[in-house]
Amino acid sequence: LVGVPVEKLPVIKPSSTVVGGVTREAALATGLREGTPVVIGGGDTKCTRLGANSEGNGRACLYIGTAAWTAVPSRRRHAFGATATTGAALKWITSVVGLNDPSSPGEGYAQLLAEAERVPPGAGGLLFLPHLMGERGPQPNAKATGTFFGLTLGHGRAELARAVLEGCAFHLRSILENISDAPIEEMTLVGGGAKSALWRQIIADVTGIRLLVPRVLEAGALGAAILAGVGVGIYPSEQEAADRVVKIVERREPEAERHAFYNQIYPYYLDLEGRVAPLYGEIPLKMREEEAPCA
């Protein structure tokens, strides 16, 4: 493989394999008991899908954190797509409109989301392309930038926030459609973005997919714990462990009228993506090339 001798590569083992125990030095540093079994574990997507119980039962999984990714059932080995900016976009707009009080960070989000919820779907004709840190999918583009389209004097921070939530949902839909080879009936939603009831509903309405919300939203950590439990024999298999441990606390259905409305907007979102894409890297580059006048 790319010139690396096979003997230099590690032996491939199941993620739940016990590979040793906590050393004395590690026990002193962490407070863990010396000899506690250590399992291999897995990467973030593997552990998150397991902690969301979306691996062996045909469900898709959507993780929303600073960025977002989704994995779907597929005849291919691994169908996965990611976007660079999702939770970060909400954090950014909260800061831009002056609601990011460091002493109470949660209050700013709550206030802005409450205001956005009072805005009807469509954000007053405002579309948002959420490429604030380049883009990973469906088409990777390091030069991609964010866009508000349709901005008028009639728009305020509530409309801006609603457009951000909807724009991220539209983009996630485009990724799902790009990697799916069969209809998706339900999807488990995890990560910090799943805390917002408004965002959960917008995603369901935009995608037309039933969302399942588990009790533990930090599914990656739970998945790692499940692997440890399987490794030491507490559970007979990963799937049986996930079936027992993961508890779904909400099933959120898409609302038919709103889904139909978003279906009308979605083609305009895709059209805007296509029209703006050739400009990525051009206008900002020109602005950097020219010597800026003094302020």
Spans of features found by a protein language model:
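Active-site core segments that coordinate phosphate-bearing ligands/cofactors
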Residues: 1-3, 13, 17-190, 194-295
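Conserved acidic, metal-coordinating active-site core of Asp-based
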Residues: 6-9
